[in-house]
């Protein structure tokens, strides 16, 4: 049986097991596999991705979001600006304080900026170009959007925007237009209504606020005010203002509100009665007595708030004078104040009947850069741009933060101790 099986051999299988004399082929050498990073292939992206700083409620945290996008191609009458710097303003905190519920979703921050144009709608190619360095105001408080994001879609017919001059840094430009325009519009209205003249006697409450600093420069350099400015400020305020504006150092008289526990009306009335005031110079550590014979004030500009000066208005403000506040009767509190909230009844009464009941004109001024109520010949955007370009005014920057340090920036602003603008750098995305 076994012999029969061995005889029955398959010649094909037998050929496969025969040992051949030819050597086996050499193994082809191969390098060890190495992973290499390669460029991502081009894709036809139909939107511009955005990184933005947002919040949901006033008590919730601020955080970064990547949900927003700008669709391309952009509208014909709009431009895209890649934001490089953003100026912080108290209105940012007031807007945030108004959101007590998260039902509105993501809320943006930031109202003024500087940056570079990256996209131009086809109808605007005659006026704007890719690469233009610009600055402007992005003010849409009721739309829950802000400019603290990597790119913004701007409508030049609605959003104030200007080319940034070489003499103004990106950080200075980002912190200029909102407060400068506030101050200029106040003074422009006072001048047109004959309240502000070259020989007017002016009191400024809050001289180291950003609006206050711009107003000081405008009054002296643009409106050519002849008399010295009386400025209510903190203990180191005089030193800050004299260092920032050395050409105006002798044009200012200072009242330290801390020495009178916030009741600045007391030293003001004393100055008017005695016709002199004591000024302390911390640098030279000496005290000087200045004569003051100007009498009551023609214009009072309040950037702090409070009722103290108003309560003594009969002894401080001239008949036919003007009192303008950007805050109201209550002292500003950035942690609690809400955007667009009502004044108290007495303030509302003054606004309606002030010129009848009292001897001066009372105005609670709100700056709305998108409002169409201004007169047709009020070209405040171009005028403010010229002020910055020709050096009439300069933005005083207190501190600059990277936007990853946004908690520190907003915490510092909440202390209400900033003496100048707070600027946030926005990284490219």
Curated annotation (Swiss-Prot):
It comes from the Eukaryota. It is found in: Cell membrane; Membrane raft; Golgi apparatus membrane; Late endosome membrane. The keyword Membrane applies. GO terms for cellular component: Golgi apparatus; Golgi membrane; late endosome; late endosome membrane; membrane raft; plasma membrane. Keywords: Cell membrane, Endosome, Golgi apparatus, Membrane. It is a peripheral membrane protein. It holds the Pfam family ADH_zinc_N_2. One of its GO terms (molecular function) is oxidoreductase activity. GO terms for biological process: protein targeting to membrane; protein transport into membrane raft. The keyword Membrane applies. SUPFAM superfamilies: GroES-like, NAD(P)-binding Rossmann-fold domains. Lipid raft-associated protein involved in the targeting of PMA1 from Golgi to the plasma membrane. May induce clustering of PMA1, which facilitates partition of PMA1 into lipid rafts after leaving the ER and its transport to the cell surface. Interacts with PMA1. This is Protein AST1.
